[in-house]
Every structure is written in C-alpha cells, then in structure tokens.
C-alpha cells in the first residue's frame, strides 16, 4: 500500500514563507555566507542548485536531496563525489512514505560515516520538512528560495516541532485516493 502526505491548499501560502533564516543575494554570495556559518559535517542540502553551489564553495553536504530539476525545468547539476546514492519516487506537492523512509535510512548511513545523495524521481520541494524531522539536533538544512536566495534552518527541538505540525496538517492519501 502506498501512503503519501499531500500539501493542502491552505498550507501552500504558509510554506512560501521561509522555514528558517533567508540569506539573500546573487549566486555565489549566499553560499559564501553559508560557508562562514556551517561546516560540512552538519550540512544537509535540498535542491539541485543549492547542492551544486554548496559544493562549488567547498562544502560537502552529509545529505543532499535533489531531483534534476529547478523551478520545474530539467536541470543537470554539477555534482561530483556522491558517497551512497539512493533513489526514490515522490510526486509534486507530496511527501511519500518511501521518501520519509529513505531520508531516515540516509541518516543511519551518515551516522556510520557515509555521505548520502538522494535523487528524487518527481519532486523534492517538500523534502526539507522530513530532512529536518530526522536530522540530528544542531544540523543545518538548506534549501532554495526562488529568486531570493537560500533558507538556512538550524535544527532545534522547536524547528522539529514546527515541521511535525506541518506534516500533521497535510492530507494523508492511501493508494492514490
């Protein structure tokens, strides 16, 4: 049985607001600022452009989640050393149970010293939410804010509670109903 969490219309506006600190600027400025704040041991990136540009400034995310698209257009990021590569299907506007399990598995691999890349077949736009839920406290999750910059989330108990609340307010869909 497939289970997914679907973003309802009433949450879409809320999620357009950054979940963390917005670092504004043209590329590479936000990534150079990011490098001053975080180190690779605590970095999780969500999105092709974010992952690619983090790597370009010398950061090596422990977990990178991307879908070979940017703003719903095909995109082939320049991403070199991957570590373990996992793939998962995740339709737009959803968080599938499979994505949740894959992110959880990625963190168990990271605890063993491996960097992990998850390539999403579909869309990873909501993946920052489960990335925060499963991330160790003190980690940093970064995702893109189109035409503005990047959003930096420091993973705290409060931040995890907020993401859990978002998940609770999503519509649960079983077997595509």
From Swiss-Prot:
GO biological process: coenzyme A biosynthetic process
EC number(s) from the headed UniProt entry: 2.7.1.237
Pathway(s) where this gene product acts: Cofactor biosynthesis; coenzyme A biosynthesis
Source domain of life: Archaea
Swiss-Prot/TrEMBL catalytic activity: 3'-dephospho-CoA + GTP = GDP + CoA + H(+)
A GO molecular function held by the record: GTP binding
Positions annotated to bind GTP: 48-50, 67, 69, 124
InterPro entries: deph_CoA_kin_Thcocales (IPR054930), GTP-dep_dephospho-CoA_kin (IPR007164)
Keyword field: Coenzyme A biosynthesis, GTP-binding, Kinase, Nucleotide-binding, Transferase
Classification via PANTHER family: GTP-DEPENDENT DEPHOSPHO-COA KINASE, UPF0218 PROTEIN TK1697
Similarity remark: Belongs to the GTP-dependent DPCK family.
Function: Catalyzes the GTP-dependent phosphorylation of the 3'-hydroxyl group of dephosphocoenzyme A to form coenzyme A (CoA).
Protein known as: GTP-dependent dephospho-CoA kinase
Species per Swiss-Prot/TrEMBL record: Pyrococcus furiosus (strain ATCC 43587 / DSM 3638 / JCM 8422 / Vc1)
The organism's taxonomic lineage, starting at the top: Archaea, Methanobacteriati, Methanobacteriota, Thermococci, Thermococcales
């Amino acid at each position: 049985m497939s289970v997914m969490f679907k973003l309802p219309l009433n949450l879409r506006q809320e999620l357009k607001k950054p979940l963390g600190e917005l670092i504004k600027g043209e590329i590479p400025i936000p990534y150079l600022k990011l490098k001053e704040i975080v180190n690779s041991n605590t970095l999780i990136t969500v999105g092709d452009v974010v992952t690619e540009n983090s790597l370009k400034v010398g950061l090596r995310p422990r977990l990178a989640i991307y879908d070979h698209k940017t703003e719903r257009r095909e995109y082939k990021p320049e991403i070199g050393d991957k570590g373990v590569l996992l793939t998962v299907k995740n339709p737009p506007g959803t968080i599938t149970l499979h994505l949740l399990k894959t992110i959880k598995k990625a963190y168990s691999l990271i605890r063993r010293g491996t960097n992990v890349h998850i390539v999403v077949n579909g869309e990873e736009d909501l993946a920052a939410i489960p990335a925060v839920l499963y991330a160790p406290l003190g980690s940093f999750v970064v995702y893109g804010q189109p035409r503005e910059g990047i959003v930096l989330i420091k993973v705290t108990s409060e931040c995890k509670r907020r993401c859990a609340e978002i998940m609770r307010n999503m519509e649960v869909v079983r077997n595509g109903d």
